[in-house]
């Protein structure tokens, strides 16, 4: 595929449980690795898929934001050997403001 300038991409949609970042990462890992195995170079996951989109008031709780950051760290470590660029959505707090963000990582 590279001979023609193409990049193999994959969009994966894991089962998401609202507020359960660790469980959501558990659901993402086999999908990410399954997409990387046949050669996907870019793997995109949904917006806010680490925490779930409909957290509502939970987004104001430090515990949810901290669990999302920890879960992202785990996801990065467990995907270090796949070689693909992975893009995943999560809430990020910066200077007291909450943002709906996408984290992109490759090779840990």
Task: List the model feature ranges, each with a label.
Residues 1-107:
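Hydrophobic structural segments
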């Amino acid at each position: 595929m590279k001979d023609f300038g193409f990049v193999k991409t994959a969009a994966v949609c894991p089962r998401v449980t609202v507020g359960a970042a660790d469980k959501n990462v558990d659901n993402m890992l086999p999908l990410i690795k399954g997409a990387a195995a046949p050669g996907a170079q870019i793997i995109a996951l949904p917006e806010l898929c680490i925490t779930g989109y409909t957290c509502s008031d939970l987004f104001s709780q430090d515990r949810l934001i901290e669990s999302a950051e920890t879960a992202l760290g785990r996801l990065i470590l467990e995907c270090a050997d796949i070689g693909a660029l992975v893009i995943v959505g999560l809430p990020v707090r910066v200077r007291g403001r909450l943002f709906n963000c996408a984290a992109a990582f490759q090779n840990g």
